[in-house]
Amino acid sequence: MATLGCAPKDDGEGKDEGGSDRGDGDPKPKGKKEVEAHTRREADERAVRIPIPEVLQQRLADDCYYINRRRRLVRLPCQTNVGAILECYVRHFSASALASGDRRPQPQRAAPERSVGLCREMADGLRITFDHALPLVLLYPQEQAQYEMVTSSTFFFPTEERASDAGRSQEAPWPGPSPPQPSESQAMAGPTAPKRRRVETDAARAPRRSTRHSTHCHWQAEDRASPQAKRSVPKLFPHLQKTPVHSTALSPIALTPGKEGSAMFAGFEGTTEEINEILSWKLVPDNYPPGHQPPPPSYIYGAQHLLRLFVKLPEILGKMSFSEKNLKALLKHLDLFLRFLAEYQADFFLESAYVSACEAHYSSKNPRTIC
């Protein structure tokens, strides 16, 4: 490519000295330069720009510092994976649209940036792009060995073990991805209240046991100690946390929003089905990924690597074919998602997520179930 870049200049010098009588000599290099300049201008005009909020830029800088300077790694699998974050955002967006009263009978009348359907498409597109891009452009060299290990078939429990453990374990990671569990609705119903109290009693003991572990593991023990310790759920859904939903129920259920949710759902008579649809929506089917293969990166990695994608995303989108209208709508939804990450960055970007390479290796040798 360097040779091609120098050729026009050399040819032009020769023609200036002795090629004045060649009528078609000058236009060729001049025309080529004009074409190249025009191509560069077109590329600049088509360049996709995704501004990253300053607070998230700082998170990227911190991420680079922890990985490259302090030689740390993100502990995998993450408690809150990329799929859960995207699913959480779509529900957040949908609930906000419902709260704003934007319930047009014909979806095409809604502005693109307020379209729940486009929001869901954006989230699914990010998930797919993340799964493909992570091993190619989103990892530092120090993370390659960890990636090879966590994507191996021996890292995760077999499907049968996962299914049997799911019924016994009380320490499943925060929603990966799944709708809110029906424990609160069962507790409100009355008959199962004693059982709930027993669970809370057991959970209350867990933090005392967790103090025996090293400080490096404290974040994991604290996050998984009890349902109340899943900090992101109430913070990310302050209006929806009191709204139970049965994932297997086809008919609408009675909603019992608390003080936080009362303002959110005030005056929403007749919208029970819409609220249920928001809360029960899933980014991927229940049977994904198949049990015979390791989960994709979006089930293993979290916010740290998802944010890295937005650094590479302009280049990736620039190589895709979009109409101006569709690209504008997509960029608007990406901007809204980045604002969401910035607003809740304290929940997603935890310093305690970075552990020593030794501890990261230990967690890889002792894999945890992905739910």
Swiss-Prot record:
Disulfide bonds: none
GO cellular component term of the entry, any: nucleus
Residue ranges of domain MRG in the record: 44-367
Biased composition regions of type Basic and acidic residues, renumbered to the chain: 8-44
Superkingdom, taxonomy of origin: Eukaryota
Entry-linked Pfam families: MRG
Positions with biased composition (Basic residues): 206-216
Keywords in alphabetical order: Chromatin regulator, Nucleus, Transcription, Transcription regulation
Localization per record: Nucleus
BP terms from Gene Ontology: chromatin organization; regulation of DNA-templated transcription
Region of interest (Disordered), ranges: 1-44, 160-229
Major localisation: nucleus
InterPro entries recorded: MRG (IPR008676), MRG_C_sf (IPR038217), MRG_dom (IPR026541)
PANTHER family: MORTALITY FACTOR 4-LIKE PROTEIN, MSL3 LIKE 2
Purpose: Probable non-catalytic component of the MSL histone acetyltransferase complex, a multiprotein complex that mediates the majority of histone H4 acetylation at 'Lys-16' (H4K16ac), an epigenetic mark that prevents chromatin compaction.
Protein name: MSL complex subunit 3B
Organism: Rattus norvegicus (Rat)
Gene transcribed to yield this protein: Msl3b
